[in-house]
Amino acid sequence: MTLKLNSTENRCVSTSTIGYMCLALTIWMVSMTNAGWYVRVYPHFAAMIMPMAVVLGVMGILSHLRARSLDAVVFFGGGILFWSAHAAAVAAAGPSTMEPLSYAGWFFAIWAVFFGYVWVGSFHTTLPRQLFVLGLALSLLATALTDWTGMPFLRYIGGYIGLISALLAGFVSASGFIAFGGEAHSPNDEHLGQTHPAG
């Protein structure tokens, strides 16, 4: 099965614009808590994280169909990370036994390794995208180290790295919107008229 992309599908804002803004908003919300601005994650963030994960999944699919592999991997990875974080928060709110922090550290370490590999794979793209993915990996690593060592200053460092990463994601999103929002084409037009396998 193939998917034929035509110009009518590419007249709106690009998937990168929506996906990176979704990442920016979600990472900003969680990083405010990690940076010590708030003492815990509040219900409004818990209510926001699942819809953002779904939007990232949709943007990942659309990016894949437009042969934008880095964006697809970042959006799928972010969506799955947020989905699993929401599932962990729901499980922790239930009557189950609390997991040891060292175990939670492994959760964040695995995601840090994942985004570290994505960062290495992003060397062919723009510097803001590279720095965003690197910042996300370092923020997750700092959270893992906090859970392993019990040193709260590492969480604060990770929180501020996360806030900077959120600003970088917002910059990537805004630059795509500014560069292509008013034109008759978008970054998705680079594959205009080409046939791509859909499976």
Show the residue positions of the predicted features.
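N-terminal topogenic module of multi-pass integral membrane proteins
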Residues: 1-59, 63-69, 192-198
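Cytoplasm-facing juxtamembrane segments at the starts of transmembrane helices
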Residues: 5-21, 68-74, 123-138, 154-161, ...
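Hydrophobic residues within membrane-embedded alpha-helical segments of Major Facilitator Superfamily
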Residues: 22-25, 29, 55-58, 77-81, ...
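Transmembrane helix-loop junctions and nearby membrane-interface residues
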Residues: 31-38, 60, 64, 86-93, ...
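Structural signature of hydrophobic alpha-helical transmembrane segments
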Residues: 40-54, 97-111, 132-133, 160-163
